Amino acid sequence: MLKVTTLHVGPFETNCYLLWDTETLHALIFDPGAEADFIQNAIQKRSLVPQAVLLTHAHVDHIGALPELLKLYPIPLWMHPAEHVVYDSPDNAVPPWLPAVPDLPPYVNELPTVPGFDFQLLPTPGHTPGGCCYYFPQRQTVFTGDTLFAGNVGRTDLPGGDEQTLLKSINDRLMLLPEETIVYAGHGPATTIGREKRTNPYI
């Protein structure tokens, strides 16, 4: 059985997620935006064994804990290849007055596979060029980062953003998922695909 733990981190209250197997205690980490010590404590409290870090995108509020966290856990880090330009650039500092994250760890080019964690990668550019979502059919769960929120969608006024591309990504990818799918967004509360179809003014 897979379980989700939500951790609110950093000044932007980014949602960092731990998706973990209750039998093996293996875990995936999504978007560790800040507070590596806090994330580590949550991992240790549950005796989890991290297997990989997966990014929905590479803005600073989603990657801030990476340097310290990957020293603690030398595991693969992956993001969509189209997001490398954001990760490798000072433009990952959002808003612009924030400093870029120093000493970012290297990423792997091949999407990690972890037994017991079967998911579909959904490329959803628009908020950033390589934004993506991770859909876990067996748990009816999708991690959307800053592509889709409860009652809102991601901003597109930052470098690499494009409103029409974002809306197309949401409609062509996310809105085709089952309505009962739980949406775990990059900020704010969880929602469902069905609820967003009915109530989100941007869809």
Roles of regions detected by a PLM:
Residues 1-46, 133-145:
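Conserved beta-strand hairpin/beta-sheet module of binuclear metal-dependent hydrolase folds
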Residues 9-12, 113, 125-128:
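A short catalytic or substrate-binding loop motif that flags glycine-/basic-rich loops and adjacent residues
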Residues 19, 56, 124:
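Conserved S/T- and glycine-rich ATP-binding loop of Class I adenylate-forming
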Residues 24, 34, 60, 83, ...:
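Short, glycine/acidic-enriched loop or turn micro-motifs at the edges of active sites
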Residues 34-117, 202:
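Active-site HxH/HxHxD metal-binding segment of metal-dependent hydrolases
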Residues 89-97, 118-202:
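Metallo-beta-lactamase
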